[in-house]
Curated annotation (Swiss-Prot):
PANTHER family: PROTEASE HTPX. It is a multi-pass membrane protein. It is found in: Cell inner membrane. GO terms for cellular component: plasma membrane. It comes from Erwinia tasmaniensis (strain DSM 17950 / CFBP 7177 / CIP 109463 / NCPPB 4357 / Et1/99). HAMAP family: Pept_M48_protease_HtpX. Keywords: Cell inner membrane, Cell membrane, Hydrolase, Membrane, Metal-binding, Metalloprotease, Protease, Transmembrane, Transmembrane helix, Zinc. Zn(2+) binds at H139, H143, E222. InterPro entries: HtpX_protease, Pept_M48_protease_HtpX, Peptidase_M48. Its main location: membrane. The active site is at E140. GO terms for molecular function: metalloendopeptidase activity; zinc ion binding. Binds 1 zinc ion per subunit. This is Protease HtpX.
Length: 293
């Protein structure tokens, strides 16, 4: 909760300062405060709703089935291993689910450290050794212990808010400039069509730029989760698991799920837009101890 409060206060403070600067420069309209509130509600609202519904949406997306009672030795091993790692990491036992997919993958999600979910693919269970699978599970438990889902949501909320706010402000200025004396027209946004088109274009452009910020954090947290897995399961097991991921099918999970999974899509225009670092970089970081605490 402290992390959420600090992020919200920081975001609010920056927005207020930005509003004051607009006021002092005289380019602010009477609707800026309302726009600030609207941007915050939409920017954070969508991100937090997604977080609160994350377990349900993730299970629905992959068709996962939560293990209520283990039906075989593999399911028993999964529960026992995650229970042990959760205790080591100081978090409550997460729910554990299995979903059908040929690729070697797993993910963790949930709104709180003590109300989370770890899901693994059948491809992982069929193609990884127990040591490798143990390391992958430790990676997911580390994500939960680090609070990565909440932090990712807060960062997404902040960038969403600023994308909406700044694009609308600039669109308002552009529309007012192109329509001449907007006050005579009684329309603080100037030409409505210009305002709409410019705001949509700017939201698209700023959204692409903002995605590089969230993807940078996503890559950063993968390195730390790998390091956490090395502490829980051993660095050699984690390196072996990452080596095994090189042999996997291209991930089949939906694009919206990729940032949650241990094995992200390797094909991208640029590493800037990748949710995961290249596997070789992750292995190198483990061997060098770069992210070890």
């Amino acid at each position: 909760m402290m992390r959420i409060a600090l992020f919200l206060l920081t975001n609010l403070g920056v927005m207020v300062v930005f509003g004051l600067i607009l006021s002092l420069t005289g380019i602010q309209s009477s609707s800026v405060m309302g726009l600030m509130i609207m941007a915050g509600l939409f920017g954070f609202g969508g991100a937090f709703v997604s977080l609160l519904m994350s377990k349900w949406m993730a299970l629905r997306s992959v068709g996962g089935e939560v293990i209520e009672q283990p039906r075989n030795e593999t399911e028993r091993w999964l529960l026992d291993t995650i229970a042990k790692q959760s205790q080591q990491a100081g978090i409550a036992m997460p729910q554990v689910a299995i979903y059908h997919a040929p690729d070697i993958n797993a993910f963790a999600t949930g709104a709180r450290r003590d109300a989370s979910l770890v899901a693994v693919s059948t491809g992982l269970l069929q193609n990884m050794s127990r040591d490798e699978a143990e390391a992958v599970l430790a990676h997911e438990v580390s994500h939960i212990a680090n609070g990565d889902m909440v932090t990712m949501t807060l960062i997404q909320g902040i960038v969403n808010t600023f994308v909406i706010f700044i694009s609308r402000i600039l669109a308002q200025l552009a529309a007012g400039f192109m329509s001449g004396d907007r006050e005579e027209e009684g329309n603080s946004n100037g030409n409505p069509m210009v305002y709409f088109v410019v705001s949509m274009v700017l939201e698209l452009v700023f959204g692409i730029v903002a995605s590089t910020i969230t993807m940078w954090f996503s890559r950063h947290r993968e390195f730390h989760a790998d390091a956490g897995a090395a502490r829980l399961a051993g660095s050699e097991k984690m390196i072996a698991a990452l080596q095994r991921l090189k042999t996997s099918y291209e991930p089949q999970e939906a694009s919206s799920m990729m940032a949650l999974c241990i094995n992200g899509k390797s094909k991208s225009i640029s590493e800037l837009f990748m949710s995961h670092p290249p596997l070789d970089k992750r292995i190198e970081a483990l061997r060098s101890g770069q992210y070890a605490r």
